[in-house]
Amino acid sequence: MHAIAPRLLLLFVLSGLPGTRGGSGVPGPINPPNNDVVFPGGSPVAQYCYAYPRLDDPGPLGSADAGRQDLPRRVVRHEPLGRSFLTGGLVLLAPPVRGFGAPNATYAAHVTYYRLTRACRQPILLRQYGGCRGGEPPSPKTCGSYTYTYQGGGPPTRYALVNASLLVPIWDRAAETFEYQIELGGELHVGLLWVEVGGEGPGPTAPPQAARAEGGPCVPPVPAGRPWRSVPPVWYSAPNPGFRGLRFRERCLPPQTPAAPSDLPRVAFAPQSLLVGITGRTFIRMARPTEDGVLPPHWAPGALDDGPYAPFPPRPRFRRALRTDPEGVDPDVRAPRTGRRLMALTEDASSDSPTSAPEKTPLPVSATAMAPSVDPSAEPTAPATTTPPDEMATQAATVAVTPEETAVASPPATASVESSPPPAAAATPGAGHTNTSSASAAKTPPTTPAPTTPPPTSTHATPRPTTPGPQTTPPGPATPGPVGASAAPTADSPLTALPPATAPGPSAANVSVAATTATPGTRGTARTPPTDPKTHPHGPADAPPGSPAPPPPEHRGGPEEFEGAGDGEPPEDDDSATGLAFRTPNPNKPPPARPGPIRPTLPPGILGPLAPNTPRPPAQAPAKDMPSGPTPQHIPLFWFLTASPALDILFIISTTIHTAAFVCLVALAAQLWRGRAGRRRYAHPSVRYVCLPPERD
């Protein structure tokens, strides 16, 4: 007895030292409680205003129940509670719940919080308590056990559960609304909590009960050093193996539908005190304090987007800017990149295509073969065929045809391999579209010398081979002309006009098609034929009498299918981007079938980080949108093997080896024992003494 008393006295003295709580050596509250910043029924905010790791509470014991065992007997609906503050910081939202079970009994609690927006009701936090003392709110210290904390965002989430309350960081004037569902025994408490920062009072969307709260939120001080380096991130935010939704997408639930643990994508295994610290750390990182460590007293609307304390700078919408207006983008943003689309498809507003857009100013093109305009009232002509040389495989000629019964061949067009801005009067009247180009004037020089060697062609700009149609005379070769030269034949031109020829049956309307060449890293243009069935080359005007009209070209995707270059995607399969001149089919033959698409032949990995955006067939769903089913739980061979299937195989192999060794040892011991027994038997042979008769002399 005399030896125990000094030890008890020493333990009592150590437990009462300043700066410790309960003799555990863990620092206490960083500042005394502030009763001015307290919601009714809640705890002081200052107790949970820290940004360093603390382990004051006991840890959770396990996972939450997947399904609800029994429905609550009574539902209690509370009035909405709203608060408005002048400054930003951490705010503790406590629901106005009174009466926590009978005084001398235990109860179980199920706490769930939802974040409400105009289009979603997202569960953000879920926790279950068990064995709670009656008359006291559920908490890790007043309950016998509690489960892991399931989170709806992150990692890490910016909210934290404090017993049955919600710790929220606020910094903007945009109000946030939360819904709580707290089940205490057989009662289910439901209500709304609303909070905002800034302004002269509650916003116009605040409930009538909202009022200005005295005091203000608490801003946690910046901890010295790096105390979170020793804390594994898996403790406070890990993937939930039982999540049944799509990854990286918020889970929205219908109104009044209770959330289950499988509705939240992440789970935290840390105790409550550590989760409160990570919430304060997240707030400090998002608020971006000044150099002296002082946070600003107030944040303007949208401070987290474009203010001086923005945590994450807004990502520039390069792709969207290039899709909407190529001329309004900074030239540095539109730098050449590998995998850039080489042809831009646009039409004017008169087209039926949903992606048509009028051209603002004519832009220079890489190489365009233009044909002289033909007046519809002039003498009818027949299409002339122009065969470009092999080294100019990426050029094409513009063909102009008048819709008359007879046709006379017109002089072929002269292809130009040099870059020159198209003249204003070069467009064929009545074609229904204008010449468009997505190349910048600053990137394309006005004039360049004629190349003497074949220019390199890109994989995406290689034209599709065409099947020669019916011709009355052999075509004449096309010769490159000087820059800005007219496409009409001259006296010095080697091209001669073809003899007139008549073609029976109706002919196609005026069609003007120009193909361009583009070097890697630049953008070319290609005219698309009019979508009007009266002027389309494959429309009813070309089909023989009595044949069914071909279906109109279908839309092959969203706006990304017809957008300009700059997004790092390969060109789509569109026949209008091949730069081929449409020819009038023979009336005696059916219209030719639509040629197959050209697939890009770039090696894998050349498209860069935007390779996952490569379009796939419609029948195949994108791999990133496919729901990943839960991993099947491992069924161990024995109850004590719970690690992995490899452990089962290793255990079987080890058991087999040990069993074989044991059998060999037993057999060897038996063999040795048998030999030892045999030697004992023959070591002392039985000797018989025989009396010999005496010898006689």
Swiss-Prot record:
Residues 670-697 are intravirion. Keywords: Glycoprotein, Membrane, Signal, Transmembrane, Transmembrane helix, Viral envelope protein, Virion. The keyword Plastid does not apply. It is found in: Virion membrane. GO terms for cellular component: membrane; viral envelope; virion membrane. Residues 560-576 have a biased composition (Acidic residues). It is a single-pass type I membrane protein. The chain crosses the membrane at residues 649-669. Glycans are attached at N104, N163, N435, N510. Residues 23-648 are virion surface. Residues 375-389, 402-445, 481-529 have a biased composition (Low complexity). Residues 446-457, 465-480, 542-552, 587-603 have a biased composition (Pro residues). Residues 322-335 have a biased composition (Basic and acidic residues). It comes from the Viruses. InterPro entries: Herpes_glycop_dom, Ig-like_dom_sf. Residues 298-389, 402-630 are annotated as: Disordered. The keyword Transmembrane helix applies. Residues 1-22 form the signal peptide. Glycoprotein G is much larger in HSV-2 than in HSV-1. Belongs to the alphaherpesvirinae glycoprotein G family. Chemokine-binding protein that inhibits neutrophils' chemotaxis. This is Envelope glycoprotein G. The gene is gG.
